[in-house]
Amino acid sequence: MHDANIRVAIAGAGGRMGRQLIQAALALEGVQLGAALEREGSSLLGSDAGELAGAGKTGVTVQSSLDAVKDDFDVFIDFTRPEGTLNHLAFCRQHGKGMVIGTTGFDEAGKQAIRDAAADIAIVFAANFSVGVNVMLKLLEKAAKVMGDYTDIEIIEAHHRHKVDAPSGTALAMGEAIAHALDKDLKDCAVYSREGHTGERVPGTIGFATVRAGDIVGEHTAMFADIGERLEITHKASSRMTFANGAVRSALWLSGKENGLFDMRDVLNLNNL
């Protein structure tokens, strides 16, 4: 990677998240917008990326081919769909480019592909790039160690009507943080739906509930409920810029790293708390 500004490429530049990633890249010192990508056939191809994001002219035009911009970036930032992200991952691995991956909804094979690629390139892969959410994950580990064995644990998440995966990647990360603190595997204790005559709640399970409505950016609550009291830890996002800023900050953090798989807690040094 270059010693000067880290040059980033933004996938899905015309989407809601893509435009805010462009804004964040243009605003953060030490980062340079090197490329912006959209799908083949998009009406946005050829547009100026800065103007597309409402940030003024940059001279970076939206392209559809990674090959065409392979010399213009050091780190690829991707918040698109799993199938597209995995294609981008293969390209970045082949060409020695770092990646920041905020895409959610990967199956186990997709996650394994990311782990495999990290042997050759540096990757920050996180379900949520908000500072607050990652502090919350640390708090959940602490709460679970104290209260997790005797309380009923539920995770409730809400997002906008356009979100296509459920539960959210952040909700799953919350469940994994709690399960790990309790020396459990989330696959063995998660309950994702309840309908009809379910019987009494099974002790030791982690329940998930999902809301999809309107323009909710993202709300997540973990509940540790006992008889007579309950603890709720909640994070509410009011703007996607919190995720965009965290992702671009992660790209800058990757400077000088040749390979390895990291998450936002590494970027924020939360693992040492």
Curated annotation (Swiss-Prot):
Biological or metabolic pathway of the protein: Amino-acid biosynthesis; L-lysine biosynthesis via DAP pathway; (S)-tetrahydrodipicolinate from L-aspartate: step 4/4
Binding site for NADP(+): 39
UniProt-annotated binding residues for NAD(+): 12-17, 38, 102-104, 126-129
Compartment(s) where it occurs, according to its Swiss-Prot or TrEMBL record: Cytoplasm
Record SUPFAM superfamilies: Glyceraldehyde-3-phosphate dehydrogenase-like, C-terminal domain, NAD(P)-binding Rossmann-fold domains
A biological-process GO annotation: diaminopimelate biosynthetic process
PANTHER family reported in the protein's UniProt record: 4-HYDROXY-TETRAHYDRODIPICOLINATE REDUCTASE 1, CHLOROPLASTIC-RELATED, DIHYDRODIPICOLINATE REDUCTASE
Protein name in the entry: 4-hydroxy-tetrahydrodipicolinate reductase
UniProt-listed Gene3D superfamilies: Dihydrodipicolinate Reductase, domain 2 (3.30.360.10), NAD(P)-binding Rossmann-like Domain (3.40.50.720)
Organism: Shigella sonnei (strain Ss046)
Primary localization class, coarse: cytoplasm
Catalytic activity: (S)-2,3,4,5-tetrahydrodipicolinate + NAD(+) + H2O = (2S,4S)-4-hydroxy-2,3,4,5-tetrahydrodipicolinate + NADH + H(+); (S)-2,3,4,5-tetrahydrodipicolinate + NADP(+) + H2O = (2S,4S)-4-hydroxy-2,3,4,5-tetrahydrodipicolinate + NADPH + H(+)
Source organism, top-level taxon: Bacteria
UniProt entry tagged with the keyword Electron transport: no
